[in-house]
């Protein structure tokens, strides 16, 4: 059987070791004779899953004690609404950094609840898209918070700086880069992330929120999106997505076994350098992102001859290189190389790219 590597942007591949363990435990979890999917979320057995997964996540990210960790429904799009409705308080304004598709999507949702001050930080030099340094961002004085997206999956654009905005409340959509490297949680008021890229399967959303920001929710905010309600109920205000929570907990344990986020940073950098090196080697492939802002997680690329795209994708699929088609907005190709993608998968892709170029260049 051909070795398959899944380059999907999300839902994305999970670590093989995690899938094997889940397979082994599926029908008889911890000797109960039932699946973890079938037990009550309030049972002592599942409460142990919840407690261990939060502890492991706190260890991985070094989350300070004055932050709550919430396991939620709704994906990042739900957080596009939850953030303003939880944080605006008496304000009607927030700074929104527009650096790409998902940042702009957050702006569109926020416009229902406030008047976002939109700050376009993209640059376009010599056909390459980049991001202004944070010190050049023109933040307003009275914004309730500053929202940005550190990694744009479609554009393949990353903001690698950590924010240093004094006492401003910083909110970040880390859906596609959480757990890929160490970050300083204390620089943020809220971090949120859909699970389906670097955490676990779709259906779970992670929120990390500083405690002093709780209790400011708009009266019209649905309780299921209220950070304080969720925190007060240990993320069990209603039935949570238990199987996704359990699998994410297995991923957290796998990350710790691999050496933590410092080790993942080294691996992710090596994978990205290998793939970008293959793209840059000749003019056959190209990436249109400034080097300083190239994403380690999502690598879009095009060919000089766009007519070859379909052939490239079909041949890649036949070689076990799946889900390389670019987003419908961007076209071309895109390789998403999250934590679970081994460097062997990237090597298989770059070998195929070189062979394809030899035959069609």
Swiss-Prot record:
- Name of the protein this chain belongs to: Phosphoserine aminotransferase
Residues that the record marks as modified (N6-(pyridoxal phosphate)lysine) are 197
Compartments in which it is found? Cytoplasm
| Reactions catalysed, as given in the entry | O-phospho-L-serine + 2-oxoglutarate = 3-phosphooxypyruvate + L-glutamate; 4-(phosphooxy)-L-threonine + 2-oxoglutarate = (R)-3-hydroxy-2-oxo-4-phosphooxybutanoate + L-glutamate
Q: What is its main location?
A: cytoplasm
Q: What does the subunit section of this Swiss-Prot or TrEMBL entry state?
A: Homodimer.
**What taxonomic lineage is listed for the species of origin?**
Bacteria, Pseudomonadati, Pseudomonadota, Gammaproteobacteria, Enterobacterales
The biological pathway it contributes to is: Amino-acid biosynthesis; L-serine biosynthesis; L-serine from 3-phospho-D-glycerate: step 2/3; Cofactor biosynthesis; pyridoxine 5'-phosphate biosynthesis; pyridoxine 5'-phosphate from D-erythrose 4-phosphate: step 3/5
Q: NCBIfam families per the record?
A: PRK05355.1, serC_1
Q: Which GO terms describe its cellular component?
A: cytoplasm
Q: Where does pyridoxal 5'-phosphate bind?
A: 76-77, 102, 153, 173, 196, 238-239
So what EC number does this one have? 2.6.1.52
The record ties this protein, via PANTHER family, to: PHOSPHOSERINE AMINOTRANSFERASE
Q: Which cofactor does it need?
A: pyridoxal 5'-phosphate
Entry similarity comment: Belongs to the class-V pyridoxal-phosphate-dependent aminotransferase family. SerC subfamily.
Q: What is the species of this protein?
A: Yersinia pseudotuberculosis serotype O:1b (strain IP 31758)
Give, as one word, the top-level EC class: transferase
Key words, A-Z = Amino-acid biosynthesis, Aminotransferase, Cytoplasm, Pyridoxal phosphate, Pyridoxine biosynthesis, Serine biosynthesis, Transferase
| Family annotation (InterPro entries) | Aminotrans_V_dom, Aminotrans_V_PyrdxlP_BS, Pser_aminoTfrase, PyrdxlP-dep_Trfase, PyrdxlP-dep_Trfase_major, PyrdxlP-dep_Trfase_small
Q: Does Cytoplasm appear among the keywords?
A: yes
The entry marks the following residues as binding L-glutamate, namely 42
UniProt function note: Catalyzes the reversible conversion of 3-phosphohydroxypyruvate to phosphoserine and of 3-hydroxy-2-oxo-4-phosphonooxybutanoate to phosphohydroxythreonine.
What is an example of a Pfam family matching this protein?
Answer: Aminotran_5
Q: Which GO terms describe its biological process?
A: L-serine biosynthetic process; pyridoxine biosynthetic process
For the keyword Thylakoid, the answer is no
